[in-house]
């Protein structure tokens, strides 16, 4: 043991202490500073002086580490305890609890109904365009194009069930093969995860809540994307899903059965049908190539109609077209016969708001889209507020322990699989994975459910929605039973394969880590969440679809270099993180690139500038030009004019001008509490200088 243990880690590097420390600081503990601020000689001690080398404060004092933002918050009960209430207070508390529970159910009901109306609004806005995507059979044979078509169509109609029913109809009519339909099913699985991502945006008010909520929503996205990246090439090379589902259909003799029970629809349909009703057969007719369906409206007008079959005299080209010789005659000019003519007679109109309006589908869709988003946002805010007021103290502790605690050893590994079964069962009950994951998102945001527990619940919801599709396929007519059942089984085994890839082994649970990383970025730069939503669900699929229209050579020529570049960046990032010593000094960080290529800070400055364009005296053009120059330059010496800088940036520059030195061999690096408080900004500047932003854009 060293004779001076407090000097074991001393580094004889002169000039490390902060300039202005003119002498040794007192060894009096920081908590006694207020009582005595003199050293051993009785002279006043400067606030920036260092402790003497013989002080053991550095060995005793424990510096509190930063709290993990992913830790579930402690929901403390700040109200009056139950034991301290009188009879009147207890009665009032009971009525308040019952009232909050009723309000919670009411807002949850409106939340689910707004999701249904939102789906109808998306179908009115983009349903016909989605049907036209399916009508181009030459593009559908391309697996990559089929994948992005599935994403775009499901995003537009906000329902994987609708897109799946269109695919089943096309396969049953021999317009599409099962092999070509499998990539579309994979794309539909990705597109359905946009709903809970939109819901997570509503919690952007609080950074920590938004961090958890957005990560909990995007864990579904990353699971679907990663599964597609692995299984789509595998399916294109081996066709294992097609072969496996064929084997299942040949082994088991399936017969027509009853449809899946509509438990949630029974509750929500009476309300949503008063707002809007759609004729979803129009989208299927457009996808089947019926040109007459282009002029039809998706808004359902007549709900009751009867079919009359009457005998009528009709003209035919010749006697060969007559129904029978006895029912055929001619008047010298035309040939007549008697035929049964079927006429559809409308009896009663539907009872919804837009039944008597002559507005086009696009206008009605925009109105419903705006209203449903407002209601969705309001309901979500109220649900979060009510849950935050109810889930306090012992109630929150019990719920969090129930949801997030594992089974005792050695059965802890079974907890996640039980959560998968729970997620599948709940999704089967509500008949929609979007509803289940969207309802779970605010619970993740307020800290009731952890990301690690939300992940298996989300995987279970993927399984639950496919079991619903299988039951719906069993209720299909005889001519479409096999095709619809095979499509549903392909969807089922695709999700099972994804779970086998990304869940059983803990280190393969990449969606959790990726979602947490995206949650951290989105919490710091909240505009990035909107960018992620637009880029990955609209821009990328539309770009790939446009390249697919140009043919395979163009798609490969543009796509392969981009994929190789992304793989190169990923490999370099892994080497920087795991074993940077094997890399050249220049490649150990991203500072060799311009700042705008490896950091979101310049982009954040541009967006902040765009949102506060007219709040300062400096003209907008001057500020934009100055900021763009600094962004492109990436040099630390580059400075904008004073009028273009924020006040915070000017203060930060003043802090960065403080010279820094290292302590000598016999200088204690520990500072008193008072000195730490005074120099907190300086230490933060030092740490910011030491760390480089490795966020690759």
Curated annotation (Swiss-Prot):
Any one GO molecular function term: sodium:phosphate symporter activity
Domain of life: Eukaryota
Residue positions with a glycan: 295, 308, 321, 356
Segments in the Cytoplasmic topological domain: 1-91, 158-213, 385-408, 508-526, 573-696
Tissues with expression: Highly abundant in the ileum of small intestine, whereas it is almost absent in the duodenum and in the jejunum.
An annotated GO cellular component: apical plasma membrane
InterPro entries xref list: Na/Pi_transpt (IPR003841)
Keyword Cell membrane included in the entry's annotation: yes
Presence of keyword Transmembrane: yes
Membrane topology classification: Multi-pass membrane protein
TM regions (residue ranges): 92-112, 137-157, 214-234, 364-384, 409-429, 487-507, 527-547, 552-572
UniProt keyword terms in alphabetical order: Cell membrane, Disulfide bond, Glycoprotein, Ion transport, Membrane, Sodium, Sodium transport, Symport, Transmembrane, Transmembrane helix, Transport
Reaction equation(s) it catalyzes: 3 Na(+)(out) + phosphate(out) = 3 Na(+)(in) + phosphate(in)
Extracellular domain ranges by topology: 113-136, 235-363, 430-486, 548-551
Annotated function: Involved in actively transporting phosphate into cells via Na(+) cotransport.
The protein's name: Sodium-dependent phosphate transport protein 2B
Natural source organism: Mus musculus
Name of the gene: Slc34a2
